[in-house]
């Protein structure tokens, strides 16, 4: 039996990496008993100490519960160096288990930080020591808890890995923008409300008397499906305050620059449930990195960032101040900061745009929506013209492959799941300026593996929105926990993700990067660790399974993952052990 998998079994019994709290310095322990700070410090070095605590926090005049690492929300910026090893000692001062997952990092699976998959978790009063060997990458990443719903309540922070050699991205200033949310509700309360009624937080519900331009037949169609065309996000600005680096819009967060400078902004979506549309009115953005991987620079005016994605951009501000806008995809709120040439300089903050409405394309009928008009920016949906929606058989499961379990966990099937890699994201298809799509991304350097895939597989993203059930292939994780998706070591696989739901899902694979099949030549397909699969559509990636071990594979919408949209991927060791 390989030593690798012997280690895995020992880890899950809690036998490796645990120590006492004595290793944590007094300053870290003391911070847990003081007020929780908003914003973060930077930690670096060959040995880094992180202490997980909890307490009360106040955001925009509302109080709530928070998990704080080293006394702050977000937790500290962990700054590392490509080619160097690092030891991270994480002490748990909570009364419950905790963990840290190093999102996007290539490392031995024993230190990936997913309880029950790669290690047993960190018990109250214990310390876990993450031993990361020489880092094989550079770029912008982040870390977060993978225990319970702690991530929602502040247990997250940024990572920067500086390159060993010259950085191809040249800038005069370098800033982190970590996007997240705050709610005064406890995360388990939010989950309970979603289980009782998926539309609980949808404050933009349509009715027969509202001003959304829906025909009577369209309204009857949506009512018959027990759905709403405004059902864009499960949790919205009705409870969330949207944050940048832990700060609400009224905190007036600013990033200083001098005229003529190039400013690098490392944008991390560390939210639990929110997609954001990023723009800086009056300033074009050059996208230079996606999920920590350098891409050929592409100039855009706006881009959508899904939960768990990262994008690095370079901007050249031209006036005294510019507003950085991170508008929630459903347009129920925004996070705001300012690029300022002097302290206190401000630019106008744009109003929220009209709400987005779902369309026939989002229902998996991509070839049937020929309106061609702007049905998003103006808050209008194209009329379906009295189509026979019954004939579309949106709930007809006969077209599903045999590996998909049909049952109450599936309330929709995409009849025509078109490849939506060229879509800019819900609400951005006709906004009158350049919006980034996955098809715009091209790897800056050639990919390492020139082989064509030797195997093709398809995974369906499934759910029942009304009952708040989410899964892969119709099976929640508790039904397949002992049936991982298996890959041979170094196997080259093409994976097609088919979204049989009306929600966008950010799908994340731990421990690997995959290449988006986005129209670029095979050697320059962009590498990512997280991909958005648009409603009713599909997305495809190529994977080289060269990181042995057990890895989490899941939707990064926290409550979807918690409800069952989670699987384990097992990559065999080089000697064939699995």
Predicted regions and their residues:
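C-terminal soluble interaction/assembly domains
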Residues: 516-546, 552, 561, 570
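Hydrophobic, well-ordered secondary-structure elements that form the walls
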Residues: 50, 459, 495, 507-510, ...
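Eukaryote-biased detector of low-complexity, proline/serine/threonine-rich segments
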Residues: 310, 314-321, 537, 544-549
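Terminal connector regions
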Residues: 149-152, 321-349, 556-564
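C-terminal substrate/ligand-recognition segments
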Residues: 457-459, 463-468, 482-514
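Predominantly extracellular/luminal regions of secreted and cell-surface proteins
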Residues: 51-52, 212-225, 440-466
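N-terminal pre-domain segments of enzymes
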Residues: 31-44, 48, 399-419, 435
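Histidine-centered copper-binding motifs that mark active-site loops
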Residues: 2-6, 13-307, 313-314, 344-392, ...
């Amino acid at each position: 039996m390989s030593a690798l998998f012997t280690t895995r079994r020992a880890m899950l019994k809690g036998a490796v990496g645990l120590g006492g709290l004595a290793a944590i310095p007094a300053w870290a322990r003391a911070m847990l008993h003081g007020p929780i700070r908003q914003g973060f410090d930077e930690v670096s070095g060959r040995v880094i100490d992180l202490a997980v605590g909890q307490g009360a926090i106040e955001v925009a005049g509302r109080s709530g519960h928070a998990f704080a690492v080293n006394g702050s929300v977000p937790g500290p910026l962990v700054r590392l160096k490509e080619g160097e090893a690092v030891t991270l000692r994480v002490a748990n001062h909570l009364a419950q288990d905790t963990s840290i997952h190093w999102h996007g990092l290539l490392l031995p699976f024993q230190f990936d930080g997913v309880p029950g998959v790669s290690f047993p978790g960190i018990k109250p009063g214990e310390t876990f020591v993450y031993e990361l060997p020489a880092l094989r990458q550079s770029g912008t990443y982040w870390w977060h808890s993978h225990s319970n719903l702690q991530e929602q309540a502040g247990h997250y922070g940024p990572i920067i890995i500086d390159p060993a050699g010259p950085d191809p991205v040249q800038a005069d200033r370098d800033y982190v923008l970590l996007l997240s949310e705050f709610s005064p509700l406890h995360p388990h309360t939010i989950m309970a409300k979603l289980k009782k009624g998926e539309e609980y937080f949808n404050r933009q519900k349509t009715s027969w008397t509202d001003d959304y331009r829906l025909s009577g037949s369209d309204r009857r169609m949506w009512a018959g499906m027990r759905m709403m065309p405004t059902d864009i996000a499960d949790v919205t600005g009705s409870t969330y305050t949207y944050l940048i680096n832990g700060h609400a819009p009224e905190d007036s967060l600013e990033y200083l620059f001098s005229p003529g400078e190039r400013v690098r902004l490392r944008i991390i979506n560390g939210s639990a449930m929110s997609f954001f549309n990023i723009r800086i009115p009056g300033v074009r953005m050059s996208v230079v990195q996606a999920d920590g991987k350098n891409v050929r620079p592409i100039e855009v005016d706006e881009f959508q960032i899904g939960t768990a994605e990262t994008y690095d951009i370079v901007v050249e501000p031209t006036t005294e101040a510019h507003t950085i806008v991170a508008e929630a995809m459903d347009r129920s709120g925004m996070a705001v900061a300012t690029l300022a040439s002097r302290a206190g300089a401000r630019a106008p903050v744009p109003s929220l745009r009209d709400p987005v409405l779902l369309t026939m394309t989002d229902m998996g009928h991509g070839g049937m929506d020929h309106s061609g008009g702007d049905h998003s920016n103006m808050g209008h949906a194209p009329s379906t013209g009295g189509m026979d929606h019954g004939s579309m058989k949106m709930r007809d499961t006969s077209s599903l492959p045999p590996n998909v379990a049909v049952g109450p966990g599936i309330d929709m099937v995409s009849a025509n799941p078109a490849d939506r890699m060229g879509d800019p994201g819900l609400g951005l298809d006709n906004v009158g300026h350049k919006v980034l799509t996955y098809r715009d991304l091209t790897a800056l350097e050639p990919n390492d593996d020139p082989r064509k895939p030797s195997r093709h597989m398809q995974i369906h993203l499934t759910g029942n929105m009304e009952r708040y059930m989410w899964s892969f292939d119709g099976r929640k994780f508790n039904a397949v926990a002992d049936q991982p998706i298996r890959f041979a070591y170094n196997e080259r696989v093409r994976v097609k993700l088919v979204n049989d739901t009306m929600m966008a899902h950010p799908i994340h694979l731990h421990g690997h990067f995959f290449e988006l099949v986005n129209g670029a030549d095979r050697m320059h397909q962009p590498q990512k660790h997280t991909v958005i699969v648009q409603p009713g559509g599909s997305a495809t990636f190529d994977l080289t399974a060269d990181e042995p071990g057990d890895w989490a594979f899941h939707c990064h919408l926290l409550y979807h993952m918690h409800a069952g949209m989670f699987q384990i991927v097992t990559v065999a060791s080089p000697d064939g052990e699995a």
